[in-house]
């Protein structure tokens, strides 16, 4: 692998060896209502993660061969947090393909509203990369003023160091479902 021309890879004799393309990834923003609070499920990236070690993010990962996007969302959720999500409850949000924001991936974003009874159990998490996730937890990020209006606790969110702009994406995605006040 001596030389790259655009996404093509050539050896030193000019023979094309293959090409590089962007990967498809999923991001799953998991929320639940607990009493009068809205919580988000976040993971802290462990020492086995490819990048952004020690930073918080929502569930995210790559699409495997022979897998649908919703299958990838369910698999990544279980691998990284132990939560089994019902793919019928996944809500598609957007596709981020802007190379200036994310050169490596085309990311499909989903939101999932868990029931209070749905929980995670990291000890049940299977697969994934070794030590990819250090910890997983539910974090209070807003208080319900009404069923469709949230008072967002921005200072609490910004005490944490986020990977992949997930702090901004959490707010962006919530604004599609709730009126947000600060």
For the regions a language model picked out, list residue spans one by one.
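Short Gly/Pro-enriched turn/cap motifs at secondary-structure boundaries
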Residues: 16-20, 101, 128
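A short coil-to-beta-strand element that immediately follows conserved catalytic motifs
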Residues: 84-94
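Short, solvent-exposed loop/turn segments that connect beta-strands within catalytic domains
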Residues: 33-39, 50-52, 87, 102-104
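Acidic, metal-coordinating catalytic segment for phosphate/diphosphate chemistry
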Residues: 1-36
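Conserved Nudix-box catalytic region and its N-terminal flanking loop in Nudix hydrolases
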Residues: 37-79
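Nudix hydrolase/Nudix homology domain
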Residues: 53-54, 127-182
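Active-site-adjacent beta-strand/loop module that shapes the phosphate/pyrophosphate-binding cleft
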Residues: 95-124, 137, 142-143
